[in-house]
């Protein structure tokens, strides 16, 4: 009995060593598994480190040339979010500036603005935004809304019968409110999107590295290395091989995950409310699900380079399907079911709750359960695919 256990552990170590040696010797695999996870999170975090956009350039078309229009432009330019970069004589001139990407939006003040206000009629200020940059669009529209609300309040005070500041404040703002940011205290885009992106980077780099690894083996005609061939003569050979390979990748990505999920947020001062013990309990099923998922996809892809196309065309879609950048309640049921095939869906949801909302492991039982189910299903699939490949004598 002891000899069998010793032989089992020896075979696992042999598979572990063979996999580690293959990863280090293959430049493409080493690049995506060891180098890319070090620098890619830094690049993304650095891009979004400013959190919010400031001084977005805007073109103003003032057809009114009145005191009210000048007041609107002055208050609008005073906003920290936007900057009046150009004054244009027509909408067409402003549109050419947008086409050249010199400005991100247009504010049009109509000719009858002052006349309508003096007649106590409703006037319209038109705002045109470049929708290709959502943060710039938000800054332009929010600043215009704030200025128009403030000027509306001033007009109400001027027309109201009140005589004191207290009466005027009740007239313009009868219901006061206080906005409290519960989790994303900065209100920035980095704290909002980066936790999901970091979890997706772990899955996609694992998929890239494993896909290249198994793609090379398929091109060479075997999935079993020469050093592990003797294992095939023993009982449950595929289990021994898969276990060794899994432990190798788990060891590598344990270090990668600690760097990506713990070091990167601290380096760029992102919100981090997680508890280390809960993170370990959550990351274990996520890594196992990602490893077995990558093995399964890697053995299904016919050529080595095909995995790069898969990752490129799925990364943005998987981020949307995770429910972080778009509410899950607004995603069609078919796509919600499709998203359940990927570990990143539950990994991102669980990590956002742990990291940004300060949840405990007991609060993400559903995500953990789904990740364990995925790990089991993809483990069995990878085991069956490897057994089928060996049965067809690819080695």
Feature locations, PLM:
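Residues that define the loop-to-transmembrane-helix transition and helix capping
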Residues: 27-28, 239, 305
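Hydrophobic core positions of alpha-helical segments in small-molecule transporters
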Residues: 32-33, 195, 243-244, 307-310
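Membrane-spanning alpha-helical segments of multipass transporters and channels
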Residues: 43-44, 65, 86, 251, ...
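Hydrophobic alpha-helical transmembrane segments of multi-pass membrane transport proteins
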Residues: 39-42, 180-264
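Extracytoplasmic/periplasmic domains immediately adjacent to an N-terminal transmembrane anchor
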Residues: 1-191, 363, 395
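Alpha-helical membrane-protein architecture signal
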Residues: 9, 13-17, 191, 234-247, ...
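Junction motif at the cytosolic side of a transmembrane helix
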Residues: 6, 17, 213-229, 370-395
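Hydrophobic alpha-helical transmembrane segments
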Residues: 3-5, 134-148, 186-198, 219-232, ...
